């Protein structure tokens, strides 16, 4: 056992069941991948994958990676957003939320993005996903991962959940709280989880989790549902946390954790872990190491009231139309820009945003110098006209979608109110005018590559896949001259520009295989 405190506590709670429950079936931490429905069906992935996997018991789209030496992050399907590399039991929580297209969904503690990518897949490109992360550097990783997964309808926030609750009360149909925890389910995966573990950390995490839960409850609309999950075994953070929350919030009821799905896994909660408070432990779920995952706890909570009626597929509510109109009006007020955001008086908050923007561009492989040289002096009207001309040629299905100019780049926005929250991304930046020409962004291809009329279609076995992901030019076979989307087995990896039978590589430098 990693720490004396952990073993003493768990032996006292479990008695003679201790050794059996903590006996993992494998020597190293379990590894898995979760397939995104935005890219492929699980059955299609299983048939086409060139590495050994077996279905995960925790999620219909999840698979256990059987080869301990396999590196998912270097696989072309990872780059194409087909799967997210995720510890198997970590994929269990998001599907239990019962997300449907058209809903407004909040992931309160979203980095690095595995559960958000599952929520995005359930939305199917319709509705709104707000993915929040409090730590700035982790929020940038979250943004990058959602772009890689091709999520078109996400707002990425770098905020405190209390500010979100104040700005967006009773706004969301579904909320996921995968709370920061003491990480006892990460002991085998991350050495730091062992070195940092102590009783004081458990108490600190329990207090933070309670605060986040209270804020999340304020964000949830009447009739909405919330999933609370952790990757720890500590009673104060699991059964005890949920029991205490229900005492503070009589407007919530504990629901069967499997009420939205047709499968089950794991074991019921433990009655001696509630801190003496009432809780139907049969409605919550634990995943023990002996069950094939590193460890997880999940509870499903429902808020009293009548759920919001969802808009018809492909439509917006009147309120959402107003938000889009407000974004367009704000765009018109911007002056011609050389890139970046409109200038304003420097203060602590703007400095924080500038620092965040610099890091974001580093992840995208764009420097401040190239940004300033790239966008030129195009006015918002000129930028929009250039985008519409580009879209009519390569993405005709997007040509009539609402578009705005933000910081010199053209954005396909998502309907989201102007709240003053720290937004890293709200929709899809599709490109900007550089030296008089429209140059597309990487996110345009990952989010909408299936709509591109000019594609260089590769198969997984094609050596050009590795060449493209390494940043090299490749021979053009199926794509005509001009901009194209480069795909692997029909899934977009990124963009390129064809000339003379060659595809000039536009895959971001920071993402390339080394």
Language-model segments: residues:
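Mobile active-site "lid"/loop adjacent to the S-adenosyl-L-methionine
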Residues: 137, 174-214, 227, 231-239, ...
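Polybasic, low-complexity RNA-engagement segments
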Residues: 1-48, 304-514
């Amino acid at each position: 056992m990693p720490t004396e405190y952990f073993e003493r506590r768990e032996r006292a709670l479990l008695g003679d069941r201790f050794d059996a429950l903590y006996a993992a079936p494998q020597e190293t931490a379990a590894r898995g991948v979760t397939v995104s429905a935005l890219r492929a069906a699980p059955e299609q992935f299983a048939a086409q994958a060139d590495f050994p996997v077996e279905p995960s018991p925790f999620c219909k789209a999840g698979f256990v990676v059987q080869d301990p030496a396999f590196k998912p992050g270097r696989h072309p399907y990872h780059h194409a957003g087909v799967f997210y590399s995720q510890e198997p039991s970590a994929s269990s929580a998001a599907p239990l939320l019962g997300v449907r297209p058209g809903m407004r969904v909040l992931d309160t503690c979203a980095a690095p993005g595995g559960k958000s990518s599952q929520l995005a897949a359930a939305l199917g490109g319709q509705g709104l996903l707000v993915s929040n992360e409090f730590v700035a550097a982790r929020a940038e990783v979250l943004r990058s991962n959602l772009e890689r997964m091709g999520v078109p309808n996400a707002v990425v926030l770098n905020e405190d959940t209390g500010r979100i609750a104040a700005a967006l009360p009773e706004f969301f149909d579904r909320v996921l709280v995968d709370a920061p925890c003491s990480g006892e389910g990460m002991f085998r995966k991350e050495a730091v989880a062992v070195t940092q573990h102590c009783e004081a950390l458990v108490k600190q995490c329990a207090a933070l989790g309670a605060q986040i839960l209270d804020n999340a409850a304020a964000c949830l609309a009447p009739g909405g549902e919330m999933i609370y999950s952790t990757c720890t075994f500590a009673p104060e953070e699991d059964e005890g946390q949920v029991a205490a929350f229900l005492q503070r919030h009589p407007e919530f009821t504990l629901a069967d954790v499997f009420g939205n799905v047709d499968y089950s896994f794991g074991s019921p909660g433990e009655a001696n872990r509630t801190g003496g408070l009432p809780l139907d432990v049969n409605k919550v779920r634990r995943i023990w190491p002996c069950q094939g995952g590193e460890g997880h706890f999940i509870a499903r909570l429902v808020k009293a009231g009548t759920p919001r009626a969802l808009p018809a597929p492909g439509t917006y509510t009147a309120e959402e139309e107003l938000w889009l109109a407000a974004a367009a009006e704000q765009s018109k007020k911007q002056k011609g820009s050389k890139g970046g955001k409109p200038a304003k008086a420097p203060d602590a908050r703007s400095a924080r945003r500038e620092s965040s923007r610099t890091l974001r561009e580093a992840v995208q492989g764009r420097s401040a110098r190239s940004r300033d040289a790239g966008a030129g002096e195009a006015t918002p009207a000129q930028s929009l006209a250039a985008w519409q001309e580009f879209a009519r040629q390569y993405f005709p299905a997007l040509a009539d979608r609402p578009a705005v100019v933000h910081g010199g780049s053209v954005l396909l926005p998502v309907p989201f109110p102007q709240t003053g929250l720290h937004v890293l991304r709200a929709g899809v930046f599709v490109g900007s005018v550089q030296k008089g020409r429209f140059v597309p962004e990487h996110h345009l291809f990952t989010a909408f590559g299936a709509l591109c009329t000019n594609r260089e279609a590769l198969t997984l076995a094609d050596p050009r896949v590795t060449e493209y992901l390494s940043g090299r030019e490749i021979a053009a076979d199926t794509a005509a001259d001009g901009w194209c989307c480069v795909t692997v087995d029909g899934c977009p990896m990124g963009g390129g520009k064809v000339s003379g039978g060659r595809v000039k590589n536009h895959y971001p430098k920071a993402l390339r295989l080394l």
